[in-house]
Amino acid sequence: MAATFFGEVVKAPCRAGTEDEEEEDEGRRETPEDREVRQQLARKREVRLLRRQTKTSLEVSLLEKYPCSKFIIAIGNNAVAFLSSFVMNSGVWEEVGCAKLWNEWCRTTDTIHLSSTEAFCVFYHLKSNPSVFLCQCSCYVAEDQQYQWLEKVFGSCPRKNMQITILTCRHVTDYKTSESTGSLPSPFLKALKTQNFKDPACCPLLEQPNIVHDLPAAVLSYCQVWKIPAILYLCYTDVMKLDLITVEAFKPLLSTRSLKGLVKNIPQSTEILKKLMTTNEIQSNIYT
């Protein structure tokens, strides 16, 4: 095989190597038992949306069933804690579904009776304005499950007249900069938005060559493809567990159009957040 550009290293074909590979391929041929195991695992890893009240699956995607104008998605413990304290306590929210999934990092099997310490992915809408949706997702959605999650939530042909806001965290060591990460004022916010998102961001935009990962990246890419206005707020922090300072780093979002009308009493919400942190510390303490 010829090189396609100067300096490219190419391997010459080797008959012996080809024969070895053919023997390995024969040894790797799938048996009926292997196929059955693979199919069982695939079924186990299917993402399902359920109504916990009725214990039934949603037959259509969430946003096909319910009209949506605004959708706020919190991914990870600190983002979830921010929405719980500042948004969910400022209005009456009704649960409309929850995601049931199983993978290497998320093994919650009983979605009907979730404890406060379990990983979860729950969807709500605002009773006074049912087109406003909120998702609290503290569980890990594996790479092979992300497309399923998007289909179950948005559907195969999503509406474009809605606005998506995503909140999540990454460790500060993932942030690429010419400076030392030790000198950065952690935690700090960066934003990344789709081409159709026209509102100003409440923090600086994420610079190249930084990238986003996992479910937040999948949601943002989906919105870019479908021309849905969406913005991701990414908090870089040196504390990935539930942390008061990291949660409060999301406070600039309270002035954005997405959240401005949803938060009524910031001092009261701050007190609720502190109580939430205290409860979490007590539950995490092995000596209590």
Curated annotation (Swiss-Prot):
Its main location: cytoplasm. The modification N-acetylalanine is found at residue 2. Residues 1-37 are annotated as: Disordered. The modification Phosphothreonine is found at residues 18, 54. The modification N6-acetyllysine is found at residue 264. The keyword Endoplasmic reticulum applies. Degraded by the proteasome upon completion of 20S proteasome maturation. GO terms for biological process: cerebellar granule cell precursor proliferation; chaperone-mediated protein complex assembly; proteasome core complex assembly. The modification Phosphoserine is found at residue 180. Belongs to the PSMG1 family. This is Proteasome assembly chaperone 1. It comes from Callithrix jacchus (White-tufted-ear marmoset). The lineage of its organism: Eukaryota, Metazoa, Chordata, Craniata, Vertebrata.
